[in-house]
Amino acid sequence: LTGAGISAESGIATFRASDGLWENHRVEDVATPEGFAHNPKLVQDFYNARRARLHDADVQPNAAHIALARLQQALPGKVTLITQNVDDLHERGGATEVLHMHGSLLSVRCLYCDSVQDNWHDDCSTETVCPVCKRAHGMRPDIVWFGEMPYYMNIIEKRLANCTHFAAIGTSGQVYPAAGFVALAREWGAETYEINLEPSHGASKFQHIYSGKATVEVPRWVESMLN
């Protein structure tokens, strides 16, 4: 499981500031269905700016993304990457199967026909026409907002029940259901690891805790898993 901390060293700011604001916006205004209904232009502009940021030259996968992709490649079919992040740095770092439980900046969804358009690199607005049903005023960011059900939960729960090792990397340990994954994994007998800049709120639930930069600690942990 990876969170915002793994992408921080790639120039993607951790979304939520200490004052609870998201890039100077209230969470309710830019990350809820109600906020989108109230002011769709504000919400579209907010995510358009974040999507555009992914295309900046200085935003590149870092050593932690690359190390996890290497782990996946070394153990084909045995490593599931679940991320709370909405960027594409895991994929650009070489990862193949990534479960984006909170959606992706690079996909948009139609409220009318529920179709999802992947590899969406352009801006999206209320005027954007759905390529499938050809209606306007219905395209929204394919992001899981507060109050919405995260994606892939059935798959994730099955993988947790069958895993032998579970690691949470760069996560706050405060956002559910992801914060509860460690308890599920331990219940089923997995060895558990937390890798964070500093111990998270849920660090006591893990058997092994590594503190430091993701670009240092993750490659080191991957080496230990492969040896």
Q: What does each of the following model-derived ranges do?
A:
Residues L1-N227:
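Conserved catalytic core of sirtuin-type NAD+-dependent deacylases
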